[in-house]
């Protein structure tokens, strides 16, 4: 992978490709929006993923979302010498199918509690512009699957939920995370948030 790539291979992906494919993701529970859409989803995924994991995890588990470390050979410029780009390029060369699997970075999915039965969940994924997720000129997504874990509770626990819901409604505290854009002028050494 250390040799320069030929000019025939012109399409590669950015790092953390799975999360870069979507500009925003919204979640509704029983028709109530709990994770509003925002164009900051890929940035949130980067900020929650990269500082959290060390090099060993990035080089193993994060390859499931197409993370390959950028490298440059000293004194050379461009994508052709970047080993990480070469790895990602080889994954999709000749229109190969790529399977990626990782959790979505949304407030609801960072909670430790399960949803109750009969709660309708809608997830809307909006695609990013190609120039944001791809390093090249063309692309096509063939198929996307969303895997959801389902937990089977014991009958005693379900009955306890039913009895509790007869007296009060359920409330789920959700920890909210906001990602905002701001501009820092060039040469500015102080920044107040």
Go through each PLM region and give its residues:
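Short, low-complexity Pro/Thr/Gly
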Residues: 1-193
